[in-house]
């Protein structure tokens, strides 16, 4: 199967592609090239960086921020800023406080304290990323959304978020049944819920649970959501990726391919290069063994940084346009 043929699309529904792996393996370059290729195929594509240490702007050589920026006719990009996301919630809270009664104000003051804690708590990055996922999931504004993810640990926390939130909402619903209006302030701790005193807390919690269930269904639908694991031919990257795929399986998220990046050519007149090549050949055999049920694609080690759309399109040629080995080596040398 050609690597490009593994993509699946449902008419009128957004496809989600997560690109992940160990830090430093080239996730952003692969994500950017994938998004460019999809956009060039006529798909309205959004690429989202969920990594707190963003490098998407550097990869595309375009200034990108917290709000979507148009890169070309079909490509849009955003770098999630959790601080800005929290600031937006604080502004919305202040607006509500200006119209609140004394009783409501007490609850909103409590919410403000919780938001302050949440902004500094572990998981704030993942909460902001999950909110973006919910937003694009429900809007179907884009044909495809590519997530350029943070290193493995962050990404697993992001993808476990629906399970965590489902448990949290369930407990809040029980608390609501037991305590009644005492949970009116607590309901707003959930990052993607609006505090609206005119709507019953139980109804809002039930709606939130429904939204989370929909998110879980989308994430576990292999026709809509897939994970592409980027590795390099080194043991630490391979074993971490193997563990990550096992964790993704627990959340019913399909890993449909392995992209092996930074594969060296055999340069026989360079002892160091030849030694590295021989070591990589052993690691490539290990990859074939570990991931025998996956589609595996190889990307060569370029002599220059792969950044900017021109060089990313060279990566597109190799990854998605089926260049043979001679053409690959020629492109590597000429970059």
Set out the residue ranges of the language-model regions.
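C-terminal lobe/tail of nucleotide-utilizing enzymes
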Residues: 1-11, 213-335
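Nucleotide-state-sensitive switch-loop elements of NTP-binding domains
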Residues: 1-17, 22-25, 30, 34-206
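Short, flexible segments with low predicted structural confidence
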Residues: 104-105, 191, 212-213, 219-220
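Amphipathic alpha-helical transducer elements in NTP-driven molecular machines
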Residues: 29-32, 123, 127-130, 166, ...
């Amino acid at each position: 199967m050609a690597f490009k043929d593994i993509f699946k699309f449902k008419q009128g529904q957004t496809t989600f592609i997560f690109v992940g792996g160990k830090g430093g393996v080239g996730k952003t370059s692969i994500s950017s090239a994938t998004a460019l290729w999809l956009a060039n195929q006529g798909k309205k594509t959004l690429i989202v960086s969920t990594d707190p240490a963003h490098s998407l702007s550097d990869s595309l050589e375009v200034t990108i921020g917290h709000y979507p920026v148009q890169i070309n006719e079909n490509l849009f990009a955003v770098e999630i800023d959790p601080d800005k996301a929290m600031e937006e919630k604080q502004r919305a809270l202040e607006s509500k406080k200006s119209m609140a009664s004394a009783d409501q104000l007490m609850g909103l003051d409590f919410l403000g304290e919780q938001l302050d804690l949440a902004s500094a708590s572990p998981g704030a990055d993942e909460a902001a990323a999950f909110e973006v996922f919910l937003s694009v999931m429900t809007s179907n504004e884009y044909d495809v959304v590519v997530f350029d993810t943070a290193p493995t640990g962050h990404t697993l926390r992001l993808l476990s978020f629906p399970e965590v939130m489902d448990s949290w909402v369930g407990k809040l619903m029980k608390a609501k049944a037991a305590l009644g209006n005492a949970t009116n302030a607590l309901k707003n701790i959930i990052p993607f819920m609006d505090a609206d005193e005119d709507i019953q807390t139980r109804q809002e919690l039930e709606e939130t649970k429904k939204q989370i269930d929909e998110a879980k269904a989308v994430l576990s639908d292999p026709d809509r959501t897939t994970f592409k694991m980027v590795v390099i031919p080194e043991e630490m990257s391979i074993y971490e990726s193997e563990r990550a795929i096992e964790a993704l399986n627990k959340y019913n998220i399909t890993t449909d391919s392995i992209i092996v990046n930074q594969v060296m050519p055999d340069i026989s007149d360079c002892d160091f290069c030849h030694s590295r090549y021989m070591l990589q050949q052993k690691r490539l055999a290990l990859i074939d063994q570990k991931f025998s049920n996956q589609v595996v694609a190889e990307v060569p080690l370029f002599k220059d940084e792969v950044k900017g759309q021109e060089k990313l399109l060279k990566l597109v040629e190799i990854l998605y346009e089926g260049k043979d080995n001679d053409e690959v080596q020629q492109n590597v040398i000429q970059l």
